[in-house]
Amino acid sequence: MDYDLFQSDDEEILATFIQATQKQETLSAQIDVDDSEEDLVDGLHLPEFNCSGRDTLKSQLCEGGFLGNGYAQLDPPRSRLDYLCFDFAPAQLAVGAVRNYLYGEACKNVQKLLTVVMGQQHLQATAASMNSGWYRVRQQVTHFYHLMLLLRGNELLPSHFLDGFRQLLNDQLDADTWKVLYFAEHNKGNDCQAPAYHLYHGVLEWRFLDLHILYASGNDQAFLGQLERTLDDLIVCAGHHYRSKHRSELIHSSPFMCRCNKELWLLLKRLIPKWLGERELDFWTLFHKAMQRHKSLHFQGESNAISLAYHELYSWLRLGLARLDEYNSEGWYQPDHSPLTAAPESFQTASLLKQFLASQPDEQQRRVYLIQLSPLQLQLGKPDTDVLCQLWEYFHRSLNCNFSVGTELDQLPLTCSNGSAYVDRYNKLLSKSHIEDLNLSSFTMYAWMLGKTLKLLPSQGRSNQRQKLLGRIFSKFSAAKLLALNEPGIHHVIELFLCLLLCHEDLSELAPKLREMLLCLALEKLPPVRRILVAKGHMALLLLHAQHRLSMDDYVSKLLNQLATIRNDAEVGAIYVGSLQAIFNLADDFNRGEQQLLGPWLAHYVEKCGQASQDRVWQTLHNLILRLSERRAVAGNASGIKEALQQHIMPLVRTQYVSSHSSWLPKLAANFIALENNGDKLLLGFLQGPEPINMAASAQLLLQVLEDGGRPASSTILQVWVKSLVLLNAQHESVLALMPHVTQLEEFRLLAIDPTSLEGGREPLCAFFGALGRRAQQEEAAAHVRMQLSHKLHAYVNHFELWLPPDRSRSELGSRFYSFLAIVIYNCSTLAYVRSKPSCFFHLAMVRFLLTTQLQAGVPPEGRLPQVVHKIFPVLLQGIGRLPYRTDAYVAKTLEQLVQHWTPHFSFSSNAKLVARPYATLLQADVDGELAQFVLQLLVTQFLVVQRRRAGQHAGLVITIMQQLIESTGKEQEEQLLTVLRGVHIPLLEHVMFVDEVDLSRNQVFGLYKVLISHDAYKRSQAVRDMCSNHLRSLAEKHLAHCTYFYFQMLINLAELAPDLVAPILSFIREQAEQVELKRGAGEDVGIRKCLQRLQKVLSRV
């Protein structure tokens, strides 16, 4: 609205009147003024309202206002006449005509402001030129009131002046006018040029000054009527202000449009008790009557919506007025320095609450109302227990409701995650002196208000009212009602109980009663979701028992009995577990029944829950055991806790140590070892039992024991180190952490291991067992020394057969483990093998891993095991080669079985060179060739035997291996070729002799011969050729008499391939043939002669 519509044009009238009055003689016109000079305050500026914009809850009042200038007194200060803004001398103001003129001007100025504000357009032309003059117009009226206040004791002051003026304002300021005026605030203050601003603030000033003048007149009836009219107008302004707000804004907004409006309310609140004196009326009584009049005029109707709107305005304005007491006499906001002792009846909280609740408010309306009610109960006045009783009567019928307003805010979790969270939440809530959070449900606000009130009542000497209030609450909780609660209802009961307990210093009386009420919610009678909620409530109460050092024996026993009735339900158990850490942390001497929490239910829960939940249990138990060494615990019931741990938790830890991946279990096992008198025995029990699925468990356990100050045996440390190197690797953090402890051992230092061999990515196992083996092979090492070293080796690898889990044998871990077997056998075979001792490393390695019953029965090995054994095979053979394999029947048999059962499985690749690699590596590594020859003899003996002229299943594989051995031999490696031939040449020729002519292996052997005779070493070495010839001679001597045809067939085929090999022995063959004929005694044998002729014919062709 454009307020600049009017400008006064009375200058000529004013000038004329001044001239007329100046011509009068001063002495004849003067009126004797009753006020004496000494009653006037020199230098006092006339107060006025100077706006600073919208009011806030804690805004300071204007220093130059009425309150700061002493106008809250019955007899306000008086100023000199020359401070008034009129164009008259002070003496002229005493002239009756002047006062008549000023009265007329005041009436006219008010009409100007009213007219322009209400928008009469015909005044627009004159208003445009007065933009800067509305403040002057308002000020002249205000100063007229100051003049009247100054002359209020003068008997000649016409009473009709103010009566008419008052009537003018009362007639013009109706509801429509206030609807335009109520928001006419501005942060520029009196520099604002809007006429509505000056009319609004002028009316506030005029009404206030008029009340002062009217009170001084002694007309009580008129004064009380005008006071009521002023309150009515102020409430109308507040009503318009209320309608401009959303409901949620009310809790953070001031009910006063600006601080000028607030200051007028505050002035009236301070003056009314002085004005009314001994009368039965006071400010709050007048206010409540004014609100009733406001309701009849502006909230007409019987609907709940109208009633609720009225009560919202009522509670908002009532709170704002109550907070005015937080301002001091100078207008400064000082809530901490203002004594607030208003009686409950002043606010009429109980009666108004009853009307509000009867109007069926929704949840948001309840929340806003309770936020505005709580300061009246707790900060601004004494608590009214009737209010809490009314609210309980209202809420207890709705416990099963969600108290939701249906907005996104209410999608936040209703319940807490566990008992600790419940206690923390309501501790934090009750620590607040006031609440303004609309996310809290109305029931939560009630519980908070109830708790705060119960805490406040004893300090006011009203303990009996607290007991009555508690009795009123408890009377509503029967067992049947508790069992009828749904999930929200149980949550509400929990938060109610917690608010009651948290506000009591001594829980010894209240806690047992509440826990028994909660125990009425028997778990077996509830569905799963409600069980969980009840369990959270129990844990919250149990925590409070622990905090206040109350006995928990009976309570815990009943809780665990209820848990047992539902078969130790894991979800309920999880709630119990969630509070264990907090309960144990609060225990100092463990004398209040904490040991009962370490029962079978906990083991049942751990077996059912997931890894993360288990870890929380382990961490809790770890922290608990650490606390048992504290002085107060030792003096208390630490022994009872230890007994419970040993009885119920130790068996659980043993099984979980093996079956769980948790890194907490090694720490917990170390804790139990520290508790034991014979800790070393328990340590060995963990280390030598079934291997944990957590491969680092042994190292982690040992490290924890060492960190705890334990001193395990050197062999134990080395065993764990070796096992960790096998199951993990040298770069694993646990192995690296263990290494400093290992290198400090005397046993380790005696091996004189080069430290660099343990670094740089090398395999420490090779260095360690290599050094151990070299120590045993030293010439000066006596038999008993070697025996001691053997014992140490077996201690280092104790129970190694348990290290590799069956399900991991085909993984990378399996490869590392089989490599470990090969490393030990290669480096320490003489220590690993003990004759006639089935438990020695060598025997166990064979029967459990390398020569298993399944393998010997013909069951193919699974997965990548053939590749793994293929890789370590030459190392194994070399290690066995250091044993007396020719004289020790067991070793010889083992070697034979390794060749027999594993060679067929080396055909996993079509790459012949790869397949033959184990034997090729052995051939190259065996310097004297003795072992290689022995192994090759075993190989051909096993697989080249011919039965019924048919080759064995794996003959082709072995022939291929032999051919690869020949091909891989360098031209300078005559000895290697001789080794091969010594081992396989004769069996190969015999295979050709006796196998069927159509068998593939026969052609394979001839193909091998082609490779042999084309080999550079064969061509260059006479010894190789001589050996081949000698083998042919030996075969002639052996087979010519009985297998004449087979021998000559083989020889003829060789002659076709290598005539140079056969030709030199032709004469020997002839002589052997003649010898056979002589032995037979039948003369020349036609068959032999024909074979000789064919052989000669073949040689002659070549």
Swiss-Prot record:
Q: What does this protein do?
A: Involved in recombination-dependent repair of stalled or collapsed replication forks.
- Localization: Nucleus; Chromosome
Q: Which keywords annotate this record? A: Chromatin regulator, Chromosome, DNA damage, DNA repair, Nucleus
Among Pfam families, the record links this protein to:
MMS22L_C, MMS22L_N
The major lineage groups are: Eukaryota, Metazoa, Ecdysozoa, Arthropoda, Hexapoda
Q: Give the chief site where it resides.
A: nucleus
Query: Mind telling me which GO cellular component terms the entry cites?
Result: nuclear replication fork
* The organism of origin for this protein: Drosophila melanogaster
| Presence of keyword DNA damage | yes
Name of the protein this chain belongs to: Protein MMS22-like
| InterPro entries noted in UniProt | ARM-type_fold, MMS22-like, MMS22L_C, MMS22L_N
Family of this protein? Belongs to the MMS22 family. MMS22L subfamily.
Q: Which GO terms describe its biological process?
A: chromatin organization; double-strand break repair via homologous recombination; replication fork processing
